[in-house]
């Protein structure tokens, strides 16, 4: 253990330290209520094998076998336990930790009730072709989000039917409509986004899962796991036969901090603060330059009218919102589906080559007004995902539940069909991976989802920032539908370019 600690490497930058390097800013935090796969050449050690055995598991549901993408399972069996121990020590020393929900004092006493974030033991090999494609798309999606957000009529018309059956989206649209009536202009616009993708095993295409425009979380943990993997490979370069520099560095935390600092600078008031909306607390007397919504994307974040009044007050203010109500609405699933329709991208993007690049990554997306697609989904539910207008994970509907939901909605002639969209289910390549949670290593047939963070800052006609800024790689068992790290399904991972 001491040896592992001695080799643990440098501490990855925290959000606070990165923000500090950009500019010294006062920050106010407001709290909200509530607080395949080929069989690997290595054999799992006893601690891993006891959990899942040593035979390569069967691919179920989520993935298809591919040699193009997979975890770099090249360590001798005797090394795996040593790597696990070193990784756990490094995580505790360098802040790659999360709150332990099972600990009674977690979140109540500083430094108490923490455990390592779940992580893959080795990085995921990932084709440079897909990486370059996602990086190239990032500024295009940043620009697209901003342009769509400026078309208030498009947002209102596209989401009009959804509003009738989805009260949460309806409340957001009401605030947006009030801003339109007031002719409220957002001269300075800040967007921190994440576009999530999977590689479709059937077509070898990188397809977009969703575009997130609010509370694009896990950038700090994503940076940490990259440093963890680089450190492990650096310490065992000879045994692993890998180059630590092939693990793609992750600058998400620093670049997002720079974007927030840049927005603060554009506000041009040295006494102003950055307001981070998380949970209940109130501060008065300070001008607010930037409001960052870490919360506010689910109905649970608005338990009373007080929260809705606060959201309206923020939108009416001169503060730079991240996201503004319009940027927030652009991230809804219905808008994603509408943008995939023929000739809609042309409404917002001018360059034909850029339009084709964006369109190429769209998976199949349909409204439930399309009866033939609905019938196809009822007959073959395993090929589709039913998505409501919700963020935060755990909301999508799959398999038999999808079929039953559609049959029920069709039978009732329910207007609630407008609350959902159908999406082509993506089947990414599966590979055998070592995954570590709660100090225990297991061997699983797994698939990955890859997200690219983006930052966009504009003041009227002047684009100040339009960048790709880091990434998030999440790996989960191929048999699972959901993929949230915090929810307990997925594991943090990094990219090893091949």
Tell where the protein language model's regions lie, with residue ranges.
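Preference for protein termini
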Residues: 2-498
